[in-house]
Amino acid sequence: QDILDAELYVDYSGPTSHSLSKWTKYHKTKRIDKLLCAPVLVSTIDHLIPATEGTKGGKQILAMLRLLTADLVLDEPDDLGLSDLPALCRLVNWAGMLGSKVLLSTATMPPALAYALYESYRAGWAQYAKANLDGWNQNVCCTWFDEFTTSDYKNRFIFDLAGYKNQHRQFVKNRISALKKEQEKKPPKRVGEIFSIQKCDETSPEKNLANTIHQAVCILHKHHHERNDEKIISIGLVRMANINPLIAVTKLLIAMDAPEDTCIHYCAYHSRYPLAIRSHIENKLDTILNRKDKSSIWETEKGVADTLAGHPQKNHIFVVLASPVAEVGRDHDYDWAVVEPSSMRSIIQLAGRVVRHRELSEQLKSPNIFLLNENLKALKGQRICFERPGFEMPRLGLANHDLKKILDIDQYNPIDSTPRIEEIKEIQKNPNGYLNLNAFEHIALAWQLFSGDKKAKVWWANTPYWCGEVQRQQRFRDSIDDEPYYLLIENEYQNPRWHWLNENQYPPVMTTETPVTFNTLQTLEMGDNVHFWFDLAPVTIYSQLADDFAIELRDVGQRFGELRIAEYSGNDNQEYWYHKNLGLHQEVNKR
C-alpha cells in the first residue's frame, strides 16, 4: 500500500538507508525513505497532523514514523484557529510520547496555549519515560529564549505546571521590560490609529469599506513614503479577513481614479491562485519587499524601477490587498498598512510586516497603521463578527464590535506583542459580552483548551486513545470537502481551462467535468491611472516554468497548477469566477 499521496513530489538526493529501512524497503519509489532520511524535513502541519488524527487508511503511518525519528519544530503554533488547537495539543502529546524535543517558535505565544502545550507534552513524556528511563524524577527540561535573553540554565528542569507557569511568567515579564527599554532607546516603528469607516446608507457595506480604504491609502502614502529626485513611492498592505469580500472590495478600489499626479498599482494576494501563480506573486514580493538595503527599491532587478519607467506620474502607490496569508511566514517590509480587524493576534502579526527591515531615523510624526474600526461583518449587522478568522462564537462574544469601544489606546499605540503574551489582569464584561478584545481572546483560548465542551485537555487528562471519537468531535481543519482542481494550458494558443482530479476513484482521473462551475472574468472597470502591479497571465508564468524544467505546458499545469477548494459548512454556492489578477473567488451578497 502506498501510504504517501501519489501527487506529492519529494525533492531529496541524500542517502536513504535508515533504522526503519527493513519496513520500508518494499516501496520501489524510495519516497518514504527520502522523507524519513532527510536531516531536516520542512512541511506544513497538515502533513504531520495525521500522526494523531488518522483513524483509517494508513495515511498516518509516515507522519508517525517521522516523529519517531526526529524532533519537532512548530512555527507560529498560535496561528491556528480555536477549533484546531485540540489537534495541535494531540500532536505535541504524541511527540512527547516518542521522546522527541519540541520547539515552539512565535512572537505572540498566549499564556493559555503555552500552558496547554506544556501539559500535553508532559503527559506524553511521562509515558516515554515510563518505558525508557529508569528512576525518572518527574522533571521535564524546558527553556525559553528570544532576541534579548535566555531563561536560567540552572532552572531548566520543571516538575509540574505550577513551576512551568512561574518560569514562563518571569520570562514574559523580562521580555516586556526589554521591549519597553528598546522603545525608549529607539522610536517605535509601528504606531496604530483606529480609522472610522465612513458610512452611507445608500451604498453597500463593501462600497463604504472601499471608499474608506481608498481614503486611508492616500493619507498613509502622503506621510509614509520614500523619494528620490524624480519619484515618490510607498508600498502598503491592506489586510482583509476573507477572500471573497477582499476581491469584492478590490474590484471597487480599482474602479476608483487615482489622485492627481498619482499612479496606484494593485496586487491581490491570497491562497486561491494555482500554485505556480501564487509562487510567482510571492517571489516578486519577497524580492521587492526585502528592504534591508534601502536603495534596492529603486533598482530594476530588486525594486520597482521598471514599473516606474512606464508611468510619468510623480507619486506611485503600490498596494498589496491580502488575506491573512500576509500576516505570517513572509519576510516583507511595508511602509504602512490598513487592517480590517479580526483579532488582536492578527493585528500584532501584521504590524510585524511594517518597517520590518529598516530603522527609523526619527520619531513617527503620524500613525503608519490604520485599524478600521469595524470589519465587514459588523457593517452588515451580523451578531458574531470576529470569527473565521477570530475567536467569537455563539457562547463567547464581545459586547461591541467597534474597535474604539473594545481596545485601549496602549494596546495599539504603539503596536507590539505585549497584549498577546501578557496574562490579563482583569476581566470586564456585561450581559452582552466582554468589553475588551484582547482580554476576550485570552478567555476564549483558555476556554477552548481547559474548560469548554470540547476542551483540548480531555486528551491528556483522560484516556480516550482507544477510539477515534475525540478526533471526530474535534476535527482538524473542519471542512466538508477538499477537492483538487488544476488550471491547464494545452499550448500557448489555447485559453487556460480548469480540470478536476477525481480522487474518489482509483487511480484518480483528471477530467474537465468539474463539480463546481468556473467562469472567467474577461474585463474589469479600471479607474484613471490605476493598474495591476504584476503580469499574472498563466501562459506567461507557465511558459517560463516549461523552459526552466524542460517540460510541456500541459505538464506544467499538472505539476504546478493545483488549487484545492475547501467547501465549508453553510456555503452552498458552487459558482466560482477567475481573473488572472484576482484569482479564484465567489460573488458576495452585497446586502
Regions found by a protein language model. Give the residues of each.
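Conserved C-terminal RecA-like helicase domain
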Residues: Q1-V42, G57-K59, M64-D71, P187-V320
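SF2 helicase catalytic motif II
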Residues: D46-I49, Q60-A95
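Residues immediately C-terminal
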Residues: H47-P50, D79-L82, P110, E327-V328, ...
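Conserved helicase ATPase motor motifs in RecA-like P-loop NTPase domains
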Residues: P77-L80, L91-L117
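Conserved interdomain linker/interface between the two RecA-like ATPase lobes of SF2 helicase motors
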Residues: L104, A114, G124-I243
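The feature captures the C-terminal accessory region of ATP-dependent helicases
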Residues: T203-K231, I235, A241-A258, C263, ...
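A short beta-strand element within the Helicase C-terminal
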Residues: E327-S343, Q349
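Conserved SF2 helicase motif VI
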Residues: M344-I369
